[in-house]
Amino acid sequence: RLIREKLLESQMASEADFLEPQPADDRAVLLVHTEEWVRKLKTGTLTPLDIQRMEVPYSPELVRAVWLSAGGSILAARRALADRVAVNIGGGFHHAFPSHGEGFCVLHDVAIAICKLQADGAIERALTVDLDVHHGNGTAFIFARDESVFTFSMHQEHNYPLEKPPSDLDI
């Protein structure tokens, strides 16, 4: 909400620029995440290790929020195809893995959007450009063997996460 308010206040965006996403459907989420991880999130049956890795407290509201974020990234990707540019200001959870959350990231919204658009035939290939100070370890892991997605991460070397699976290009 704060980002939206600042964008409006600075006149970098108007109310008409904002779209309200719907939560991603489970079929889209399951293109990236395991059935077990989705079940744990939906039923609240996470283990202490699951919660420790996520680094955020579990709640039903959290589950609604991450499904909404994934829906926002799908919507932004579709709008970018139509309008040449779009942003999900509530996304970018690049530490989420298929079978667990990590580093404040529960679902990998960007990977879900890419895989959903590929499954729908809207795109064949994708490029992820990750300029966060932290390496996008979830992104690198998810797309490690997928030649249709090129992963680029520019990050601080000696920072979270400790283990950094290689992206296609790391700087």
What residue spans do the PLM features occupy?
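HDAC/HDAC-like amidohydrolase catalytic core signature
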Residues: 1-171
